[in-house]
A protein has these predicted regions:
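Short conserved beta-strand and strand-loop elements enriched in small hydrophobics
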Residues: 5, 73-83, 353-361
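A generic structural signal for beta-strand entry/edge sites
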Residues: 2, 46-50, 102-109, 219-223, ...
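Extracytoplasmic/secreted envelope proteins and their assembly/folding machinery
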Residues: 151, 195-198, 267-268, 315
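Polar/acidic, low-complexity leader/linker segments enriched in S/T/G and N/D
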Residues: 1-28
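An acidic/polar, Gly/Ser/Thr-rich interaction patch typically located in mid-to-C-terminal regions
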Residues: 38-69, 247-403
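Short beta-strand-centered interaction patches in the first periplasmic/extracellular domains
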Residues: 101-117, 169-264
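Surface-exposed cap/loop segments at beta↔alpha junctions
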Residues: 64-173
Length: 403
């Protein structure tokens, strides 16, 4: 069996019992993850939303014990790659959502760490609605900090600083020094979930990638390590030697390689907070491709958010969109066996990290080794996984993307 599944306590991370999940699908991206069951329905597509498990999957001796195991958000699951150890290597973490109980089985969704933190808000205890006339005047200010330091400090505020808010997350960058500042007003609570604030920070120009990685703290407890890129290197750090995959006609360690192509966008109209003529605006553009010998036609896009409350923030977001789209791009996907030696090792290689792909005799791509960032992994109960890599410049326009 390639995988193991465990039930455990959401708050403490204490492992309870193993679960038998015969068929499932999973996915792992830079900042989020999913796990769902797959079932043969006879007709139509195979697939399911969330998990549907037979009662036999739960080692419970009574209905009361089943109820305790399925308490929504109080219990969680971890999917671990079976590496031969007793517990396996934890890969996917999720809190049990609201179950639907049937005679033969039970269905529920899993809430990833990011989803769970979508219902935690950056508001200090005792500071909401306590101003004159039931107003909220409290303002949270962070200054002289790194972006991941702000994220981790917000994480501590949204977890350990709240009653019943503890989660098994290690916020290891809290208070880290840097050159950034952020201000959050309590009255704007609807836009102050940790998930929303983290998404906003990650999407600014130079914003850090971040990820929650499960690991066994000891033989009984699973915890989540909050990993994030730094101000100087926003990408996630490598956890070992950069792996090399091979792809050539009729073989290789990565199979079914496909290439998606995307044209450039040369202008970004950015808008932020404000209304009508007072709306904050910024135009980011790079018209080099429109003025070359064999020009590209102009493509314009927009980017907007009412949360962008300063001219610099609007500029940063518009510049970020332009930087990601101003050249023609390609994106590679392929399948790998997780059991192949020298390939992708789960628990050592994570989305957001670098992978070398050596490509030969492809019908379109030039021969060479392409160093790309892994964006997502997805698979099922087998040892096969689909890898999706970050977009890179079209190699026929930029020969530096391979060697």
């Amino acid at each position: 069996m390639a995988w193991k599944c465990w039930l455990y306590d959401t708050i403490t991370g204490l492992a309870d019992v193993p679960l038998d999940v015969p068929q499932f699908s999973w996915s792992l991206s830079i900042s989020d993850s999913t796990l769902s069951t797959t079932r043969d329905k006879g007709t139509g597509d195979e697939g399911g939303s969330g998990l549907t498990l037979p009662w036999s999957a739960f080692p419970a001796g009574s209905r009361e014990a089943r109820a305790r195991m399925l308490a929504p958000t109080r219990r969680a699951m971890v999917l671990a790659w079976d590496d031969g150890s007793d517990m396996g290597v934890p890969i996917i973490w999720g809190a049990i959502g609201e179950p639907t109980i049937g005679w033969e089985d039970v269905s529920f969704d899993l809430s990833s760490p990011l989803t769970l933190l979508g219902s935690r808000y950056a508001v200090r205890e005792g500071a909401f609605g306590t101003g004159a006339g039931s107003t909220s005047t409290d303002v949270i200010r962070y200054s002289g900090m790194s972006l991941r330091g702000i994220l981790a400090s917000l994480g501590e505020l949204c977890t350990k600083a709240k009653p019943g808010g503890m989660l098994p997350i290690d916020w290891r960058y809290a208070g880290e020094a840097g050159r950034h500042e952020r201000t959050y007003s309590a009255y704007d609570v609807a836009n102050r979930s940790w998930k929303q604030l983290a998404t906003n920070i990650a999407n600014v120009n130079g914003g850090p990638d971040f990820q929650f990685r499960p690991h066994w703290a000891d033989s009984q407890h699973v915890r989540l390590s909050f990993e994030a890129g730094s101000d100087s290197e926003p990408y996630l750090a490598q956890s070992g030697i950069i792996p090399t995959l091979t792809c050539f006609a009729g073989g290789g360690t990565i199979e079914d390689m496909s290439v998606a192509c995307l044209g450039p966008a040369m202008r970004v109209y950015g808008t932020g907070s404000g209304s009508d003529e007072a709306t904050l605006c910024h135009l980011s553009q790079d018209l080099a491709l429109c003025t070359q010998a064999d020009p590209w036609p102009l493509v314009e896009v927009t980017a907007s958010s009412s949360d962008w409350d300063s001219a610099n923030l609007v500029k940063s977001h518009a510049d970020s969109v332009l930087a990601a789209s101003k050249t023609p791009l390609v994106q590679l996907t392929g399948k790998v066996s997780l059991s192949d030696e020298g390939g992708i090792t789960l628990g050592q290689v994570w989305p957001g990290q670098l992978v070398d792909v050596d490509i030969r005799d492809h019908p379109w791509l030039p021969d060479g080794t392409y160093r790309m960032r892994l964006m997502s992994m997805a698979g099922d109960q087998s040892d096969m996984a689909t890898l999706t890599f970050d977009q890179i410049p079209d190699p026929w326009s930029d020969h530096t993307v391979y060697r």
